[in-house]
């Protein structure tokens, strides 16, 4: 059994790594805390989430840049450059796959089994939905269908628990709704379903805004703003009666939507 001193030391290193923007080491430290099979505190949970979000975020940004350059080179007919870019893009995809599989193992084997609070359960299933969604951004064919289905299942489990355990204005529940709606828009290519979910949660939360305590007010109102921004963006993609729906992968649209930490 690990001593509380060891746990304290790992958390301190994670804080230092965050300050120094050394996110790979931040992830390593918090993964070691998770491997102790203890229920994480809110701070520990957030450190783990921020670390992985940054580690995966830099690769997602790289992948988008490479995909954009690849499309331009392809349009110019530069086949040799397209092949070079594809090889490099696949390297980034391999890194993304490893990172996402890594956090999924930590969640399934250590974090969820150590959970006692509904809030933590929602947090971890939301994370699972998010990281399967990140895989679905670049996977193709049957692989994409598999990770999309797993993402949907995780978001649905998180939503069921959130509806039973958390008030509608809780930042974790709002963040879940935000990311779940982004999933419908980007991965399922369904602006109608994305808008329906985002609008329902936005309207319910706005009517309960007075119940937000001081600690949650800033985070809650920020996520509500993101929900509203996405609704404004996505509404333009819903066809009027008699019009055709927009073609193409939603993830390739400009400003496909913002998600929460």
UniProtKB/Swiss-Prot annotation:
Cite a single GO BP annotation.
Answer: protein localization
Which InterPro entries does the record cross-reference, listed alphabetically?
14-3-3, 14-3-3_CS, 14-3-3_dom_sf, 14-3-3_domain
Give the region (Disordered) as residue ranges. Answer: 237-261
Task: Give the SUPFAM superfamilies listed for this entry.
Answer: 14-3-3 protein
Quaternary structure, per UniProt, is:
Homodimer.
Q: What is this protein called?
A: 14-3-3 protein 8
* Cysteine pairings via disulfide bonds: none
This protein's species is Solanum lycopersicum
Superkingdom classification of source: Eukaryota
Give start-end ranges for the coiled-coil region(s): none
* GO CC annotation, single: cytoplasm
Please state which protein family the record places this protein in. Answer: Belongs to the 14-3-3 family.
